């Protein structure tokens, strides 16, 4: 037996070895076979048998003569692309010369080459032909290789030119070139390239698909349009005058008479307008530059504004004086020529003639003037500069001019005032009503006959108020017109901290919390109050309070409108009653404060322009762009260009109008002048500056630059640009979209925390008139919509299903456009939105959000990329549509297409259903509520940090958030947080997340997977294949675009050394990149650009700042990272490794805590992350959570349940505390949410140098420029010195003075009406120290225009 065993032992061992290593043997055989194939293929070809030779030669013998074949073999040897040479040169075209030099063998030899299978020449030809075929295959494989050099490309081009150029001489290889080419074409090189290229085939294909699927924004999205040129049929002066008067919307009856235009030329320094001249014309600069100055005592002049060519010098308030026949003159305002220029002067006295002919036609222009006064002048000076009482004329100065009128009828009534019986509070109510009628008629400029008295008496009622009673609160919308009959009222304003009143987040909260109410003006008997509110339809600008026991006559808005229809001439006296209370200071400032109207696409300013003014957005929307990249967007209430004005730097970005916008322009000279006149303005501006610098959504100066995927399309992430929205247009993508139910659902979700108005064509036609929808631009409709936008914080415009005038109007009015589509259907080739964009430019620059509606039973969305690749969308949202939205679909199916496009009856039914059943049951966790919070800037973001197995605590925190009713609108994470966040974004159900996360943690606990994934540690210990398989099995091929909730994850790009924020692409790949710990897993090659990505924890382990930049107002950050020990051993300035080793080996001592090389490298890698985390902890927007997970290690994946329960316990306590301490009511229940008002936009301003500190900017803001005042005519007008006139450094110091520089002229007959007060010249002071001004406005000026006398000492 031993003999047989020893005989067959090797055989038994061989069989056993083969049986146990079948795969290894097969792999070895395949490798050897492949190598043998390439070697034999390169050296000998496939075969040398006669049959193969015959088969190879037969096609040639059939297709061409023997003589032709004899020429082909040498030709193949001389060119690089022999097949093409055979095809082109083998049968040369007629008339094409050929210079190919070949040696023709004898014919007998050619026959032998064809018929003999053993001929050596034919065998060599075959080998060369096959070798060249392999070369061609190799070139086709590597032609797209990124490693190709320009030399290779040029060689290919030369070869193509040689081959395809008919009749050209084939290029012969040089000796060196041939050897070099042979080395690159070896079989081993081919195999190497096949392996290398094949391993990247998936990622290359993915990259090409991603580049093709995303649509770039249109060119108009970033670049402003050019200004319109002057029509050739119009003279420049006519064009400029009409352009500057366009904002008034003058009646069609008024026509411009070119004969009234006077054009004059001026030299530099010449006066165009001097103090004392009449203010009854508009001045327009045809060419050159003009400067506006304020003239003071002793001939001092102060530059406050520069007017370029095309600009105008005119105050709209002066127009009311002219219409009221009040002589208006310039007090101290002067206009001078900075350069040699031409100026057009147009007298506006023709306005008065047109007004007297048709007062009703001038109601709209008068309303525009009063609205401009409120929106531009009063709002800017009060809310942004902190002025209140300075804006109104003081009582002792105003007493003389109350009830002043210019009409002859009213003058007659004023002359009889002293003979009238005064109002007696003890009279009966009927006698009081008679007096009230008469006084009200006089205030309206009417004759108090029986008819007028009867009409007024039916529309007014009398009320009595005790002292201190508040009649109307500031900001109230109660529109009434009141006349004081007895006693007096006080108009007061609260503190001017605009942002603190709205958001209560001011830098000086302690001061703003105190009630700061200041009395502005006192209103006495026979004066009107409330005209500003009733004419503009705006909330009250003042708080009206009774100073003593007061008796007033009140006319409500509807009664005033009815009386106005009968007597349209009363509109002007009511407007002038507002004008008479304005202080001389405000009337002077009005000349320098510009009302800028910017149409869609036009630039407010461009990059590189001098920053000589700041802008306040009154309405509309603007976008700041830089190098085809969106920096930010501005909405109502935002301030533009303040930082650049302070730092005196050119504009860093270009700001263009997204839609028609109105702005208030404050020149730098005017800003400095106001600070000199009222130094407290400087403190207010410092406070405003501090509000911008205290914003927590500013990027930290040390933060790594973020690369968001939409940057490749020329824009930053759009979610941060949809804040501060005031108007939203909803456009259906197809006729089957339930548009009316969608707008009702959105209205329901938005109305939980602010007032919302939903407008459709049907509702507008019912409120106004169906005829307003027939015109493309109806002024009545435009004004009505503007009033609604001023009244309601948010307006939803519901578009029609077709291209109607109403649809175009909605797009023009919209700050953002929501394109609603059915998610389960493929996008149509021609949608309504695309048709609208092709037909006109309305809304082409507006951010468009794609809304995909899905049935409630949908598990996960899919196919989102098909929608995104057809049209450009700045963002997308997935919404589960409740079943109630689809209950009207059957009715739509029964209707014709025309009936579907105008669903009037169905709309009424839908609205009625929602009003009865839906509007009273808010649901904060619905998808519509999530969309509403994102649109209003109140999104709640959840950030999950990295920490390995400790990330199981995130699952517990998610369950705690759900139990406490805290919704999550955006999810982001790093490392393990990206995986848990991806699970929640894919399925927003904490139970499902827990199940799937537990399964993945269980797989990560397997030791065999780790052993099978081990490899030679060149880049990492593991290949990453098993880890990739586990994540792929979890997410499959899900894309980030197909997640229910907006999601991002963080990775570290070691190719460019920056942080990457991923918001699109394959979910598993970027989760894998975010979890790739260096040394354990190799970096992931980005599927889009091939960059190497590692764990995001190296740069930002808790990306709360990224979440804030994406638009989240409240960020809940859960940190599960390890805490590094800081109590280390102090070993001095040198360290011996042997000493440390001996200390650790000593069993009787405690080893010192000294970092080894691996720990030092790890801490260096996390330096920026640790610093970022400290900033996040201190941020006011961040709610920082840290479960007690210190006992657990990074790789404790088997302890999932234990860690999760710990996170759940901690999360319940933390969430309860968050809701308790949430003063803003963002995280609380519905009742708390209703107390919250929408956040106003206070985003960061365009980038300025970070070297400029807040202290430097505050000093620049509050600094009063010290300049040397000069006498008139001595001002330097050289624009080459320190820039154009009117820029920084060209202003003049203003001494305290009586600021009587308005165009205000009062009737002398109105002085001391009741005879109960006496005035002297010294008492007629409004602002500043005593001066020589006399009473009555115009009396203080010399009628001849001479220099005013100096003030008395």
Curated annotation (Swiss-Prot):
Listed GO MF terms: lysophospholipase activity
Main location: membrane
SUPFAM superfamilies in UniProt: cAMP-binding domain-like, FabD/lysophospholipase-like
Compartment(s) of residence: Membrane
Sorted UniProt keywords: Hydrolase, Lipid degradation, Lipid metabolism, Membrane, Repeat, Transmembrane, Transmembrane helix
Motif (GXSXG): 973-977
Cross-referenced InterPro entries: Acyl_Trfase/lysoPLipase, cNMP-bd_dom, cNMP-bd_dom_sf, LysoPLipase_patatin_CS, NTE, NTE1_P-loop_dom, PNPLA_dom, RmlC-like_jellyroll
GO biological process: lipid catabolic process; phosphatidylcholine metabolic process
Coiled coil segments of this chain: none
Motif DGA/G, residue range(s) on this chain: 1095-1097
E.C. number: 3.1.1.-
UniProt: a nucleoside 3',5'-cyclic phosphate 1 binding residues: 245-372
Residues binding a nucleoside 3',5'-cyclic phosphate 3: 570-692
Gene3D superfamilies recorded: Cytosolic phospholipase A2 catalytic domain, Jelly Rolls
Transmembrane stretches, start-end: 12-32
Region called Disordered, residue ranges: 49-188, 199-218, 1230-1249, 1274-1293, 1305-1353
Short motif (GXGXXG): ranges: 946-951
Gene Ontology cellular component annotations, sorted alphabetically: endoplasmic reticulum; membrane
Domain PNPLA residues, every copy: 942-1108
Binding site for a nucleoside 3',5'-cyclic phosphate 2: 444-581
Membrane topology, as annotated: Single-pass membrane protein
Family: Belongs to the NTE family.
Protein name per its UniProtKB record: Patatin-like phospholipase domain-containing protein ZK370.4
Native organism: Caenorhabditis elegans
């Amino acid at each position: 037996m031993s003999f047989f065993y020893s005989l067959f032992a090797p055989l038994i061992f061989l069989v056993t070895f083969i049986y146990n290593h079948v795969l290894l043997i097969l792999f070895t055989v395949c490798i050897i076979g492949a190598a043998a194939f390439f070697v034999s293929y390169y050296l000998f070809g496939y075969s040398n048998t006669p049959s193969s030779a015959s088969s190879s030669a037969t096609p040639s013998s059939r297709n061409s003569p023997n003589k032709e074949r004899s020429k082909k073999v040498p030709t193949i040897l001389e060119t690089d692309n022999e097949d093409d040479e055979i095809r082109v040169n083998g049968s040369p075209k007629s008339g094409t010369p050929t210079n190919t030099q070949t040696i023709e063998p004898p014919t007998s030899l050619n026959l032998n080459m064809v018929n003999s299978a053993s001929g050596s020449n034919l065998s060599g030809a075959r080998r060369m032909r096959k070798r060249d075929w392999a070369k061609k295959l190799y070139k086709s494989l590597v032609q797209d290789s990124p490693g190709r050099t320009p030399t290779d490309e040029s060689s290919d081009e030369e070869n193509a030119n040689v081959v395809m150029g008919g009749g050209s001489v084939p290029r012969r290889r040089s000796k060196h070139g041939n050897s070099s080419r042979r080395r690159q074409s070896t079989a081993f090189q081919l195999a190497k390239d096949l392996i290398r290229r094949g391993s990247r085939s998936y990622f290359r294909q993915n990259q090409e698909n991603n580049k093709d699927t995303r649509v770039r924004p249109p060119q108009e999205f970033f670049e402003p349009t050019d200004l319109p040129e002057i029509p050739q049929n119009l003279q420049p002066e006519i064009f400029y005058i009409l352009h500057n008067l366009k904002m008034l919307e003058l009646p069609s009856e008024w026509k411009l008479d070119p004969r009234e235009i006077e054009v004059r030329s001026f030299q530099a320094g010449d006066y165009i307008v001097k103090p004392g001249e009449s203010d009854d014309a508009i001045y327009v600069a045809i060419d050159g530059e003009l400067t506006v100055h304020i003239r003071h005592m002793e001939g001092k002049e102060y530059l406050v504004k520069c007017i370029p060519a095309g600009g105008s010098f005119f105050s709209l308030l002066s127009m009311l004086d002219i219409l009221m026949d009040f002589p208006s003159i310039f007090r101290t305002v002067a206009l001078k020529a900075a350069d040699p220029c031409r100026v057009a002067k147009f007298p506006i006295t023709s306005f008065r003639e047109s007004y007297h002919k048709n007062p009703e036609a001038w109601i709209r222009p008068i309303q525009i003037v009063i609205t401009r006064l409120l929106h531009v002048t009063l709002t800017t000076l009060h809310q942004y500069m902190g002025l209140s009482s300075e804006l109104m004329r003081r009582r002792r100065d105003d007493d003389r001019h109350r009830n002043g009128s210019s009409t002859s009828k009213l003058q007659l009534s004023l002359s009889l005032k002293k003979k009238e019986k005064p109002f007696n509070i003890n009279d009966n109510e009927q006698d009081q009503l008679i007096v009230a009628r008469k006084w009200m008629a006089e205030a309206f400029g009417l004759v108090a006959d029986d008819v007028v008295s009867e009409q007024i008496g039916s529309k007014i009622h009398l009320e009595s108020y005790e002292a201190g009673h508040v009649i109307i609160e500031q900001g109230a919308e109660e529109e009434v017109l009141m006349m004081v009959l007895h006693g007096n009222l006080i108009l007061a304003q609260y503190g001017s901290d605009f942002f603190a009143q709205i958001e209560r987040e001011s830098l000086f909260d302690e001061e703003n919390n105190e009630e700061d109410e200041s009395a502005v003006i006192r209103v006495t008997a026979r004066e009107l109050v409330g005209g500003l509110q009733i004419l503009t339809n705006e909330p009250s600008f003042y708080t009206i309070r009774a100073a003593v026991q007061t008796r007033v006559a009140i006319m409500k808005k509807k009664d005033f409108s009815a009386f106005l229809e009968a007597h349209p001439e009363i509109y002007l006296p009511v407007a002038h009653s507002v004008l008479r209370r304005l202080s001389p200071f405000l009337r002077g400032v009005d000349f320098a404060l510009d009302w800028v109207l910017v149409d869609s696409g036009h630039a407010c300013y461009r990059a590189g322009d001098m920053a000589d003014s700041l802008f306040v957005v009154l309405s509309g929307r603007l976008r700041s762009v830089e190098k085809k990249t969106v920096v930010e967007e501005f909405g109502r209430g935002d301030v533009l260009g303040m930082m650049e004005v302070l730092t005196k730097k050119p504009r860093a970005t270009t700001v263009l109008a997204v839609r028609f916008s109105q702005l208030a322009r404050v020149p730098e000279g005017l800003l400095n002048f106001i600070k000199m006149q009222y130094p407290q303005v400087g403190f207010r501006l410092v406070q405003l500056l501090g509000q911008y610098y205290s914003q927590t959504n500013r990027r930290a100066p040390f933060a790594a630059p973020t690369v968001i995927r939409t940057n490749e399309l020329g824009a930053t992430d759009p979610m941060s640009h949809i804040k501060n929205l005031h108007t939203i247009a909803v456009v259906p993508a197809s006729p089957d979209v339930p548009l009316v139910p969608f707008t009702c659902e959105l209205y329901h979700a938005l109305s939980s925390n602010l007032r919302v108005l939903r407008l459709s064509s049907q509702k507008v036609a019912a409120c106004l008139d169906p005829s307003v929808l027939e015109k493309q631009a109806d002024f009545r409709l435009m004004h009505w919509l503007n009033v609604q936008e001023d009244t309601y914080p948010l307006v939803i415009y519901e578009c029609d299903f077709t291209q109607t005038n109403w649809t175009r109007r909605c797009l023009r009015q919209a700050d953002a456009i929501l394109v609603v589509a059915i998610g389960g259907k493929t996008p149509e080739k021609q949608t309504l939105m695309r048709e609208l964009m092709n037909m006109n430019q309305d809304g082409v620059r507006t951010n468009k959000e794609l809304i995909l509606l899905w049935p409630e039973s949908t598990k996960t969305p899919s196919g989102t990329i098909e929608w995104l690749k057809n049209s450009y969308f700045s963002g997308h949202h997935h919404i589960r549509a409740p079943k109630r939205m689809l209950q009207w679909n059957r009715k739509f199916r029964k209707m014709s297409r025309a009936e579907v496009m105008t669903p009037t009856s169905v709309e009424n039914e839908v609205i009625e259903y929602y009003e009865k059943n839906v509007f009273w049951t808010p649901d904060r966790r619905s998808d519509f509520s999530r969309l509403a919070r994102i649109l209003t800037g109140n999104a709640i973001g959840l950030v999950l940090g990295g920490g390995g197995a400790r990330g199981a605590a995130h699952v517990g925190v998610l369950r705690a958030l759900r139990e406490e009713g805290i919704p999550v609108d955006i999810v982001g994470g790093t490392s393990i947080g990206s995986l848990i966040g991806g699970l929640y974004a894919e399925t927003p159900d904490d139970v499902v997340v827990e199940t799937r996360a537990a399964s993945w943690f269980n797989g990560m606990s397997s030791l065999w997977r780790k052993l099978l994934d081990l490899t030679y540690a060149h880049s990492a210990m593991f290949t990453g294949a098993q880890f990739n398989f586990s994540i792929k099995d979890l997410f499959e091929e899900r894309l980030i675009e197909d997640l229910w909730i907006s999601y991002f994850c963080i990775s570290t790009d070691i190719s460019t050394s920056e942080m990457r924020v991923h918001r699109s692409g394959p979910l598993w790949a970027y989760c894998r990149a975010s979890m790739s710990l260096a040394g354990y897993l190799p970096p992931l090659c980005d599927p889009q650009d091939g960059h190497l990505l590692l764990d995001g924890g190296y740069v930002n382990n808790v990306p709360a700042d990224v979440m804030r930049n994406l638009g989240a107002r409240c960020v809940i950050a859960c940190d599960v990272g390890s805490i590094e020990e800081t109590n280390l051993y102090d070993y001095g300035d040198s360290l011996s490794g042997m000493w440390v080793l001996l200390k650790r080996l000593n069993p009787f001592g405690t080893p010192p805590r000294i970092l080894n090389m691996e720990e030092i490298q790890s801490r260096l890698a996390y330096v920026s992350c640790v610093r970022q985390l400290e900033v996040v902890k201190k941020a006011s927007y961040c709610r920082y959570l840290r479960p007690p997970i210190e006992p657990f290690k990074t790789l404790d994946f088997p302890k999932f349940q234990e860690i999760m329960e710990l996170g759940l316990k901690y999360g319940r306590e933390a969430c309860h505390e968050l809701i308790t301490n949430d003063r803003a009511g963002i995280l609380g229940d519905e009742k708390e949410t209703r107390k919250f008002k929408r956040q106003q936009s206070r985003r960061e301003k365009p980038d300025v140098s970070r070297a400029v500190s807040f202290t430097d900017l505050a000093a620049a803001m509050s600094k009063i420029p010290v300049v040397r005042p000069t006498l008139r005519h001595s001002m330097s007008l050289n624009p080459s010195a320190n820039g154009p006139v009117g820029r920084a450094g060209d202003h003049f110091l203003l001494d305290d003075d009586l600021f009587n520089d308005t165009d205000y002229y009062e009737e002398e007959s109105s002085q001391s009406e009741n005879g109960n007060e006496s005035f002297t010249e010294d008492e007629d002071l409004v602002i500043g120290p005593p001066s020589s001004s006399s009473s009555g406005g115009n009396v203080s000026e010399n009628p001849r225009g001479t220099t005013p006398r100096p003030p008395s000492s």
